[in-house]
Amino acid sequence: MIKLLKFYQDRGIKIIKGEGQYVWDEKNNKYLDMHAGHGVAFLGHRNKVIIDHLKKQMEEISTLSLAFDTPIREEMIKELDELKPEDLDNLFLLNSGSEAVELALKIARKITKRRKIVAFKNSFHGRSMGALSVTWNKKYREPFEPLIGPVEFLEYNNVDSLKSITEDTAAVIVEPVQGEGGVIPAKKEFVKSLREVTEKVNALLIIDEVQTGFGRTGKIWAYQHFDIKPDILTAGKAIGGGFPVSAVFLPNWISEKIEEGDHGSTYGGNPLAAAAVTAACKVAKSEKIAEQAQKKGELFMRILKEKLEDFKIVREIRGLGLMIGIDLKVNPSIAIKVLQDEKVLSLKAGLTTIRFLPPYLITQSDMEWASDATRKGISETESKRVAS
């Protein structure tokens, strides 16, 4: 019998359905889902608005090349216009975050006629060849070298390191909050300096918002926390409300230099994807999801800090909006397993961080549940550390 390749460690439970911020396993156990498909389900599982738009579109046409116009794309553009990144009036739709990063890197090389890309230590931008080339973790990169280069990795949140960005740099790619790297928010001084340096040497600034974008951090786009504007922005995950969609946003001065055949995607911008983005935009506006993420994120961080303040192995609780990391002084795997046993799903970030990526629908009661489970997980981690 054919078998699925396993690139992920099996979590040992079979999920059969989801709704809102919860999922259920085959034994009908209910879980608070703060894994959320690596953050995809920010608008909640089985969001009714998303489902209704997808059902309607499936009854009309589900696949169509971007060579042909169709009404749902026109509606999507109208709904997205209010939420688009400032001055980035052009977009191309793809299917995954890695694909969006690939296109952003291609555009940077074409526009600048330069080759070098600058990225940052602890970054994660994807696992396809180009995206992997600007991803820091050597475990991901080394088996597939040589990759695309030259790429130079600088210290994140270190203004002095930006001196390495010179006139041979095509682009700098950066996450406003490093997700896989440990849920590390960028410092405002760092981001503003980065924008100044890239402008000085005419290098493009690519902001990777595949995980941070579409409201999760308390703004529709996380770069808006830093009073700067990017040259290119990549988006994904939440923008499709659970449907696989990603996007690259560009300003007019770049789009004018893009030519037929520079890129393409068989499924990119298909009618179902356009319907999903249309619906997601409606939810984002009607539910004020960014404002909810900001308020709920602040409350969740406060509850976590109160519940975990007496643990010596907790190094830091950090994050932005509903992108939260609990950084330990030890491996968090035991705590993540205990959380799952307590019916709270989370994921690891970096070497020592528990990552929470809940849907915006999370309630204070959910936060208390998660915080109590986290306390139990860290307590067990601490006990086993002492015993060993």
Curated annotation (Swiss-Prot):
N6-(pyridoxal phosphate)lysine: modified positions: 237
Enzyme Commission number: 2.6.1.118, 2.6.1.124
InterPro entries found in the cross-reference section: AcOrn/SuccOrn_fam, Aminotrans_3, Aminotrans_3_PPA_site, Class-III_PLP-dep_AT, Class-III_PLP-Dep_Atrans_LysJ, LysJ, PyrdxlP-dep_Trfase, PyrdxlP-dep_Trfase_major
UniProt KW keywords: Amino-acid biosynthesis, Aminotransferase, Arginine biosynthesis, Cytoplasm, Lysine biosynthesis, Pyridoxal phosphate, Transferase
Gene Ontology molecular function, alphabetical: identical protein binding; pyridoxal phosphate binding; transaminase activity
CDD domains: OAT_like (cd00610)
Needed co-factor(s): pyridoxal 5'-phosphate
Pfam families, per the entry: Aminotran_3
Residues binding pyridoxal 5'-phosphate, per UniProt: 124, 208-211, 266
Free-text cofactor note: Binds 1 pyridoxal phosphate per subunit.
Listed transmembrane segments: none
GO CC, alphabetical: cytoplasm
Pathway(s) where this gene product acts: Amino-acid biosynthesis; L-lysine biosynthesis via AAA pathway; L-lysine from L-alpha-aminoadipate (Thermus route): step 4/5; Amino-acid biosynthesis; L-arginine biosynthesis
Locations listed in the record: Cytoplasm
Protein family: Belongs to the class-III pyridoxal-phosphate-dependent aminotransferase family. LysJ subfamily.
The protein's assembly and partners: Homodimer.
HAMAP family, alphabetized: LysJ_aminotrans_3
Name this polypeptide is given: [LysW]-aminoadipate semialdehyde/glutamate semialdehyde transaminase
